[in-house]
């Protein structure tokens, strides 16, 4: 029997790190038993099956077994077991009791909306203090997930349990059939029709899925997630060309943040994988999906079986393989595959960018400049132009670098790296540019570190601690964290603690000159 509830989440934990009350933000929990669906399985899953899993790993910290972790684990287990009312209350308590942090609230806002706990997303959103950092993500969450028809709590929990049963309990047919009996709810609610479409697709009833998703979109034409599902539904129909049409519409969606931009690209690759008829092209898109998801080993395994007799496919396979190897820090292999790609297509921007990055890494500025200039002609992401400006900075041509960054910012609202570089070049606008950087990409660690530096210089140590905590969560092995924490402790007069952190920084990077200077080495 179906009651009322919702479905998946990733979450954060606050853990103490230093004796001076430092709070670190840890990630969502891996509940262990459920693994992402393998799209190559004989019984294919959906994009929702693949991504809607509690798969984030808990970051280690001194309180990694604390009550907050246990609280989250219990809430998520209840949700997956369709004990949605109790799960809702547990998540609500977590939002209300977590140590205040805009970063944590931003993530909770996104994750609660993604599972249909819209009122909890609003609760988390209401606790955010700095709109300069959170505003863009909040707007994306609303455009991507929020229904146009505001559900009362009873209906919200009911639909959440429908989703839970479709998603986790192998009751998609029963749950969908039950929901289709709720005439009043389907008449009013766009989200209810979305769930019928999702459940019907999962059951293989593509005709009903098409009908229901069209109703959902008619009721809420701004919802990006509905449009994403529509493209996926048609990719599994006998009308794949229509799926590609809808996918192209998705590509022009009004997205503000890298978080959702990446989500759309990832789901787009999954839809292309579903729609492709050529086996090699199918594998290429599946590999790109894994690459977008950070599953580099899986991407590489698929790419190794993607080489075909057609050069127009191979050039893209070689370019993507070079990107995977570069991210795996296997630079020689990355270079080899990038060269293979440009042997087929000399203007392949992805391969040229990889070659430029390798040249820049080797301090061959002339070669890097050549590669990035050539790549920028076809690169719509502005990555090549940003890297070209970095080359000019290394050549002490700051004027030329600023011209490029300014040009990018005139045409792109999501070029967070350009905002970041401008922050470092224009100190009178540094804080505003850094906050814009973080607003576009909340997971960009360098932005948080530099915000901490700005606050340390102002003597605003509490703010600096908060920013440092976020930076440490993103990469707990970054030596710069210990350097800036050392500066903070030094500013507070805790010289022994400061010294220990400078020493830790040098243990991690013996060549880091600022830490050497602090220790007078």
Which role fits each region the language model picked out?
Residues 67, 76, 101, 110, 135, 161-163, 189, 198, ...:
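Residue-level recognition of tetratricopeptide repeat
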């Amino acid at each position: 029997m179906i009651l009322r509830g919702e479905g998946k989440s990733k979450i954060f934990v606050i853990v103490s790190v230093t004796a001076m009350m430092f709070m670190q933000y840890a990630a969502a929990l891996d509940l262990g038993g459920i693994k992402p669906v393998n799209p190559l399985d004989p019984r294919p899953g959906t994009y929702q099956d693949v991504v809607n899993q509690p798969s984030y790993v808990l970051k280690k910290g001194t309180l990694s077994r604390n009550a907050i972790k246990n609280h989250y684990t219990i809430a998520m287990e209840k949700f997956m077991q369709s004990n949605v009312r109790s799960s809702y209350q547990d998540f609500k308590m977590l939002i209300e009791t977590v140590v205040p942090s805009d970063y944590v609230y931003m993530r909770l806002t996104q994750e609660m909306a993604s599972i249909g706990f819209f009122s909890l997303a609003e609760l988390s959103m209401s606790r955010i203090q700095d709109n300069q950092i959170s505003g863009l993500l909040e707007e994306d969450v609303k455009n991507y997930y929020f229904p146009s028809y505001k559900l009362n709590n009873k209906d919200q929990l009911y639909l959440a349990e429908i989703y839970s049963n479709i998603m986790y309990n192998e009751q998609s047919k029963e749950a969908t059939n039950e929901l289709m009996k709720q005439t009043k709810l389907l008449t009013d609610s766009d989200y209810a029709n979305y769930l019928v479409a999702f459940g019907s697709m999962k059951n293989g009833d593509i005709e009903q899925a098409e009908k229901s998703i069209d109703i959902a979109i008619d009721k809420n034409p701004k919802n990006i997630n509905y449009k994403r599902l529509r493209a996926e539904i048609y990719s599994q129909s006998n009308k794949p060309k229509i799926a590609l049409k809808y996918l192209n519409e998705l590509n022009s969606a009004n997205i503000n943040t890298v978080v959702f931009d990446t989500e759309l690209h990832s789901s787009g690759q999954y839809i292309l994988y579903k729609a492709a008829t050529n086996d090699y092209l199918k594998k290429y898109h599946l590999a790109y999906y894994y690459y977008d998801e950070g599953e580099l080993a899986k991407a590489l395994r698929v790419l190794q079986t993607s080489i075909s007799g057609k050069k127009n496919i191979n050039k893209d396979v070689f370019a993507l393989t070079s990107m995977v190897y570069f991210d795996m820090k296997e630079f020689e292999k990355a270079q080899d595959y990038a060269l293979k790609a440009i042997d087929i297509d000399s203007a392949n921007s992805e391969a040229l960018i990889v070659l430029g990055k390798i040249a820049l890494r080797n301090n061959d500025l002339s070669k890097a400049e050549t590669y990035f200039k050539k790549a920028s002609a076809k690169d719509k992401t502005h990555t090549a132009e940003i890297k070209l400006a970095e080359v000019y900075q290394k050549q002490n041509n700051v004027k030329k670098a600023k011209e490029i960054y300014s040009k990018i910012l005139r045409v792109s609202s999501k070029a967070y790296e350009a905002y970041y570089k401008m922050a470092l070049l224009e100190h009178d606008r540094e804080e505003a540019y850094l906050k814009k950087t973080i607003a576009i990409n909340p997971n960009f660690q360098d932005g948080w570190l530099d915000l901490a530096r700005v606050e340390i210089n102002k003597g605003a140590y509490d703010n600096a601690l908060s920013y440092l905590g976020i930076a440490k969560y993103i990469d707990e092995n970054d030596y710069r964290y210990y350097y800036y924490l050392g500066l903070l402790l030094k500013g507070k007069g805790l010289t022994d603690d400061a010294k220990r952190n400078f020493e830790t920084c040098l243990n991690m990077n013996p060549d880091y000159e600022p830490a050497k200077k602090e220790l007078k080495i």
